[in-house]
Amino acid sequence: GQKLLRTAQREMAYPIAVTIARRGSITGDQWYKASRTVYGPDDPTVKDRLLLILAIGCALMGSALLLLPTLIRALPGRYAYYLPEPLQALRHRPHPDTLPTPDFTVARTVPPLPYPTPMPTLTFTPSPMPSPLPTPTPSPTPSPTPSPTPTPPPRFILTRFRHEYQRWNNCGPATLAMGLSYFGRPETQREIASVLRPDPEDKNVSPEEMAGYVHSLGLGARVAVGGTLERLKRLVRAGFPVIVETWYVRDARDQLGHYRLIIGYDDAMGTFITQDSLDGPSLHVRYDQLDELWRVFNRVYLVLYHPLREGEVLAILGEDGDETRMLERALATAYEEIAAPPSTCVAYARCEDWVTFGWFNVGTNLNALGRFEDAAAAYDHARRLGLHHRMLWYQFGPYEAYYATGRYEDVIALANATLATASNLEESYYWRGMARLAQGDIKGARRDFEKALRYHPGWSPAQDGLAKVEEMEKR
C-alpha cells in the first residue's frame, strides 16, 4: 500500500498539483480534466491511476473511522471532556446503569436484617404512700435566675475564603484548598492533588485522606458521619468551616460524588451558603436539597479547626465524639428513613433511590461497627433495588463486608462491574486483588496490586497486598 501510494504521488499527484498551481484552484469536477491535460487525452492509465488514488483514500478513511473509538478512549478524560458530545459518547463502552445483583443462593444464607424494635414507653403507676407527718414550712431561699439562651442569628457567613474552580475530577483537593484558605494557608488544589491524587484521572479522594493532609500541616480535622443540618449551622457559627461529601445529579444515569464547603446559612432563604468548586463561589443550596444529596454518603463531614480549639469541636459533636455511639445513632437514622420514605424527593433522579441509599447507609454503619454479616445483608438489599454504577467509585464498604464474610466472588463481580465504567480505580483493583489472593490466584492478585500502585504510587494498602503476594511466592 505504501509503495502504491508513493507511486501515485510521484507519477500523478505531483503533475496535477503543478497544473493546479498554474491554473489556480480547481473544483473536484475539473480534476479529471486536469489529469488529462498532464498526461494527454488518450492516456489509458489516467483513469486507473485516479481509481487507485480514490481506493487508497477510501481505505485510509475507513481505517481512521474504525480506529476512532479506540483513539478517543485512549485520550485522558481531562482532554476528552472538551470533545463534542457525539465523540464523547464513543469513549464509553456499554455497561449496565446499576451494579450486579447478588447471587440469591449466597444471599439467602445471610440472616435477614430486621428493623430495630422501638423501646416501649415506660409508664409508672404510683403506689399508695402513707400520709406524711406535718413538717414545718421552710423559708424560701432565692435561687439564681438562669441566663437566657442566646437566639442563634437567622443568617451567618464566614469570610476570608479563596475560591478555586476545580480542575478535572479535582473537587476534593479544590474544596480542601478553599477550606484551608480560611486559616491563611497558601496551598492550591494542584499542590494538594500532587499528594492525595497523583494520577490526574483518579476519581476520588476520601475524607480520611483529606484529614490526614490537614494534620500534616499542623491543623485539626475530624471526620464524622450522621451529621445534621443544625450541627452544620452550629459548627459554622462557631467559626469552623465544614466539608460535606454529597451526590451530584445531572440525570438518572449521570450521577457522581461531589464535595462542597459549607461557609454559612440563611434561614430566611432556607439555604446553606457554600463554596462550590464546580458551580461557583457563595452558592446557595436549599436545606432539603443538600440533606437529600448528603444522605447518599451517610451524611459524612470533615470539620476544619485550629488544634487549640478541638475541645469546642467536641462539645458541639456531643455524644458523636464517641465513634461507636456516632455509628449507632447514624444506623438508627438510616433504619428510620428506610421505614418511612417520603412521598416526594427534591434532588434524586428517581425517588425510589431513597430506600436504596438508605440500605446502603445501613450497610456502611454496620460495616464500620464490625458487624460484617449484617452489613453484607444490607448491601444485598441495596443491590437488589438497583445501586448506581458509580457508587463504588467513592464508597468501598461492600468490598470489605463481602471480603470479611468470605464472599470473594461478590467482591470480584463488583470490582469487574465498577472497573468496566472506569479503569483507574485503585480501590477496586486492591479489593479484587485481595479476593483473588484469598482464592489462591497469586498471579491475578499481583496484577491487581501492581495496577493499583500504577494509579496511586506508594499507596500503602496495595503495597501491603503486594508484600503478601511476594511472601506467598517464596513458599
Residue ranges and their predicted role:
Residues 224-275, 425:
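Active-site-adjacent substructure of cysteine-protease-like catalytic cores
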Residues 148-226, 298-320, 324, 328, ...:
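Cysteine-nucleophile protease catalytic domains, especially the papain-like/related folds used
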